[in-house]
Amino acid sequence: ALVFLLAGVGLGLATAMGWLSGFVRLAHLHVLLAGWICITIMGAMTQFVPVWSAVSLHSRRLATAQLWLVAGGLAAFVAALLTLNFALLAAAGSVMLVGFWLFVYNIFRTLPPLTEFDITEAHFALALGFFLLATGLGLLLAIDFTTGMLFEWGFNRLAVVGSHATLAVFGAVMTTVVGALYQLATMFTQTDLHRSDPLLQRFESVVYPAGVAALAAGRLLENPVLARLGGLAVVAGVLAVGFIVARKLLETQVDWTPMLSRYAVVTVMIGAWGALTARAWLVDPLAADSLLAAPGAVHLLAFGVVGFVVLGTLYHIVPFIIWVHRYSDLLGYEPVPMIDDLYSDRLAAVDFGCLLGGLLGGLLGVFAGVYFDGPTLLLAAGGALVILGALLFTANMLLVVRRHSPHTLVGILGVPGDHERGEDDPSPAVDQE
């Protein structure tokens, strides 16, 4: 996932500078969303659904296979987009589809019975359904490049693209994000639910999934009324979640952490995205330039909301997994570090500043270009800060693995063989920063 993050940032720069040919923007979007975001979601669900639900993972072999199928398929898919090799595009898309569907099957078999679902598990189950629909439409779009079958079936290709993007971003990704935030925001602020919170959660649990389905169907069928109703429901559901998380952050009972700092950015970006996008979707929910947000505001959602949720969550997930495997058995027998001691606070602070500055600079640059035909200096500066922040974040996570994991990086990736650290490997001691 970290490799795809860096590749996505690089492709974003190449898109802005015009360095590559082919479908560069499409490759950029798929590397970040299908690569960095979705592979992170796959790993997080595989690791934490068994913990949250107090069950055993259905199959670790499937978990390893799905990673390589999605990662390998996506690498070939991106190469096909850049070289305009449409035959390879369909083949690579098929490999990705198998990987995603293995993931859906594995997690669905891991989840408890439907009657025992809590709100997080219910959102995860819905997200799995959206994964099936989004990837299925995605493969049809890849095949359509060489067959033109969508036209023969009476569908507008751009309408199918809009439905696919809606199911992928608002269905698969955002439904997962919402479900995780309900669990994580409560857990890591050590706060209780207000009397209004269950009402907001029930409102969102009905309105948001129905809105995603209506927006996707409205775009597929080119029905503006259905799409408009669905879009407004999506905005209302996301704003409800943002309100709950913002209140928990204000009432937090714990010291501020990199995770909470990034979640704070998320709540602000949700408000800004909702205000701009509601108006755009009221006017025209089928417009190509307002597919995920108002014109010029797509990064509010993609980076400001989804990206910062993933970044903040990884600041807990990666150290937590390493801590469990390396130190949990030593607890009570010898001094062990806290989870937040495993990463560098200094790097975390600097990467946060770079990424936030890059986001704000990029947004101002995009808005200047869209609405005022302004210069691209802000956009270039923002992009440079994002690249630096992504590199620092990746370095911080890799240092956690290098210094503290009982396994080598090769072993963590699931390559067969003995990849335990030997006695000559660096000791995973506590950082002294």
Please provide the spans of the model-predicted regions:
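Hydrophobic alpha-helical transmembrane segments of multi-pass integral membrane proteins
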Residues: 1-433
